[in-house]
Structures are given as structure tokens and as C-alpha cells.
């Protein structure tokens, strides 16, 4: 979609500057289709992080993120807590989705935690949603960009 291409361009810029990127998706089921779009655009495979991957794979990904070898992670809520060496951008796709809320064990909202991490690390965050949320549109730092189908700003 148009919104995906816009934030892919932002992510490409971050990667070209030597930083890592994190894309949060609300559901594990969205990962496969999203990963295909990513590979078509970037020409490489991102790391994928969620509860369904094996312990061995998690260890490999954890190490690759910590040493900076892995440039992009597509993940569920828990990917926020990965040890990025040089995180440069967080993207929360479908930020309005209730799946970002963790209600069992330690309760938190991954969207809010992403905002906090971006603030703590002094990096940009892109909150992607079909329309502005009231909480965002009232923020003094909120900028709304609307796109038509041809991707030209309105």
C-alpha cells in the first residue's frame, strides 16, 4: 500500500546511514505477507521476531541485532526489547490495533513503549494508522500527511 512505501523510503534512508530499523506489526499472521513486500523493495530478508520462532533462531537474531549485523527486524510486541546496537527508526504499523496491548503477565501497550523507547534513544518513530488518533492529533509535535492513491501529499 501507499503508506507502506512511504515508510519503506524512510527506513531505506536510515539503513543507508548505518542505522538499524524496527517495524512492529500487530499480528504474527501478517508477517509472511509483509516480509515478501519487504524483500521485493529492499532486496534482502529482514529478521523476523515473534513467539513462534525457535529458541536457536532467537539466539542467532539476538546476537545479530546486538552486534549490528542485522539491519531490520520485523516483529511483534516483544521485539521492542531487543538489544539494538544502533537503532535509528521505529515504525508501528496499524498503531490503533488492540493487539499491541499485553494483558497477561507484565501488562503494557507496545505502541506506548515504542514511543518511550524512541524518546529515550532520541530517534524518530512513525505511527502508521488509516486515520489520525485523537491522542496523536492533539500532540504539539504531531504532523499529519495524507496521501492519495498516487502517493502525492495532499
Regions found by a protein language model. Give the residues of each.
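Motif I (Walker A/P-loop) of helicase-class P-loop NTPases
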Residues: 3-12, 114
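Conserved catalytic network of the ASCE P-loop NTPase/AAA+ motor domain
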Residues: 13-17, 39-41, 64-67, 81-84, ...
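Loop/turn-to-beta-strand initiation segments
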Residues: 19-21, 45, 68-72, 86-89, ...
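Residues immediately C-terminal
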Residues: 30, 79-81, 96-101
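Conserved motor-coupling elements within RecA-like helicase/translocase cores
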Residues: 36-73, 84-85
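Hydrophobic residues in beta-strands of the RecA-like P-loop NTPase core, especially within AAA+ ATPase
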Residues: 75, 92-93
Amino acid at each position: 500500500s501507499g503508506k507502506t512505501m512511504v515508510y519503506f523510503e524512510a527506513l531505506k534512508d536510515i539503513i543507508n546511514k548505518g542505522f538499524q530499523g524496527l517495524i512492529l506489526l500487530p499480528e504474527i499472521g501478517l508477517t509472511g505477507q509483509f516480509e515478501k513486500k519487504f524483500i521485493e523493495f529492499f532486496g534482502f530478508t529482514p529478521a523476523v521476531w515473534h513467539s513462534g520462532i525457535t529458541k536457536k533462531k532467537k539466539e542467532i537474531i539476538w546476537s545479530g541485532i546486538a552486534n549490528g549485523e542485522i539491519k531490520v527486524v520485523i516483529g511483534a510486541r516483544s521485539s521492542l526489547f531487543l538489544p539494538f546496537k544502533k537503532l535509528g527508526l521505529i515504525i508501528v504499523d496499524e498503531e490503533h490495533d488492540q493487539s499491541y496491548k499485553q494483558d497477561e503477565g507484565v501488562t503494557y501497550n507496545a505502541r506506548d513503549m515504542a514511543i518511550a523507547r524512541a524518546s529515550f534513544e532520541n530517534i524518530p518513530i512513525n505511527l502508521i494508522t488509516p486515520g489520525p488518533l485523537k491522542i496523536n492529533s492533539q500532540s504539539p509535535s504531531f504532523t499529519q500527511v495524507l496521501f492519495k492513491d498516487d502517493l502525492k501529499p495532499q
